[in-house]
């Protein structure tokens, strides 16, 4: 079996290139060296470069995020599809296999996935017909409830400017009680991205860390 030195060796063999994001051109904090150049060259040669990302963000949000980092549609890729897009299509088509229309979002809010649809995001888990499992993160107050785990939290890069800080965790302990309570309800759980871990670069600097995710 031949092991290729890099993507550039085989890119010219194909008309359409399907490219994952995390671990392919993005390491959680920066672009892998040479990755953007290879993608740009493929686009220049007329290849269709489609990014397939399992982020729960909608593609429009991901496009804007990568623009801020230096990657641009039409220059480095031609198409961008996310797990959030696919989930959103199922929502709009009312194809979720759940007993009602009330959704409780556990974790970081992702209300945009359900906006302008037949489904309603409810603030209380007791009102829910199903749970949507979003990104497990903690507010500062929630984080401080676990003083013995203080060295296991990192300021999330997903904290939007002007919003209260959100913290990623290296351990699952802070989330177990609330998940157990949901499990006891016996309701369906929905998840657009069941990754167990993701290497994320802390917002306040440092190397990417293997933080807990939805899986």
Regions found by a protein language model. Give the residues of each.
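HAD-like aspartate-dependent phosphatase fold
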Residues: 1-215
